């Protein structure tokens, strides 16, 4: 009877160890991808800012170019 009891405790302990090890592995993988995305986010942010700035400049130039064509009835 004691042998069964100890073996069940060992089984539960091993299962808990596997569960904790799995959680640590998932956290390590997630943190790696987070770090990679943070590392390259500044490059993409700069490109996005340039594209937005160029689009606003184009709109402004179009509107300013059409100011002389405005007529007041």
Swiss-Prot record:
Compartments, as annotated in UniProt: Secreted; Cell surface; Fimbrium
InterPro entries found in the cross-reference section: Class3_signal_pept_motif
Cysteine disulfide links: none
Induction: Expressed under standard laboratory conditions at 35 degrees Celsius.
Proregion residues excised on maturation: 1-10
Protein origin, superkingdom: Archaea
Modifications the protein undergoes after translation, according to the UniProt entry: The N-terminus is probably cleaved by the prepilin peptidase EppA, which recognizes the class III signal sequence.
An annotated GO cellular component: membrane
Statement: the UniProt record of this protein carries the keyword Secreted: yes
Disrupted-gene phenotype: Disruption of the gene does not change the piliation compared with the parent cells.
Keywords: Fimbrium, Secreted
Renumbered ranges of motif QXSXEXXXL: 11-19
Domains (record comment): Contains an amino terminal motif QXSXEXXXL, which is part of a class III signal sequence.
Stated name of the protein: Probable minor pilin MMP0528
